[in-house]
Amino acid sequence: MSVAQEGRRSGRLPFSRRALLVLPALVAGGAGLGFFAMLRGLGTGGYDPRGVPSALIGKAPPDFELPPLEGIGLPGLSAADLKAPGRPVLVNFFASWCVPCVIEHPQLMRLSREGVPVFGVNYKDQPADGRRFLERHGNPYARLGVDLPGRTAIDWGLYGVPETYLIDRGGVIRWRMAGPVTEDTLRADLGPLLRRYA
């Protein structure tokens, strides 16, 4: 008598079928525990999205071409603008609905006033909302592309907004900041890197 026939007779499923029934529950339980651990880390400060590495560091930006934000009078943004800019530039992904984007905006305005080219990507935002955001908070951007569907953000490996990248004079991504650029970030990280890659 085969194992399957014996299992049918005894009312028990053979091992392979039991495993198929139990395996999804184990996978779901493991994923749930991992998610709970991440949420717990968020509450205690143990989980930091800035610690998520970028696969793009040391590489050229991915190929992309974004249309301009209408009504602002700036050109759009493409990978060609970053191939060899001749000086360090920042690429900043932002959205009008993003509270941390408002927090970091004064730092971007400061960098722009100091002569650092800041290129913007308006991420998953309605054009009218993006325009209102810049009218309200100021416009630090020398170029500004619209990524309404979010495809370019996916290609860049965007974790969320705001997210800022430093591109060196030769067109290589040297630094990434997931989260708002703050005064501390400028002093400790970005400022020294801008001087290094100038």
Stretches found by the model and what they are:
Residues 136-140, 148-194:
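Thiol/disulfide oxidoreductase modules built on the thioredoxin-like
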Residues 92-97, 123:
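Aromatic-flanked redox-active Cys/Sec active sites in thiol-based oxidoreductases
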Residues 62, 89, 161-162:
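Short loop/turn microsegments at loop-to-beta-strand junctions
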Residues 102-138, 147-154:
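Structural microenvironment flanking redox-active thiols in thiol-disulfide oxidoreductases
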Residues 96-103, 163:
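C-type cytochrome heme c attachment motif
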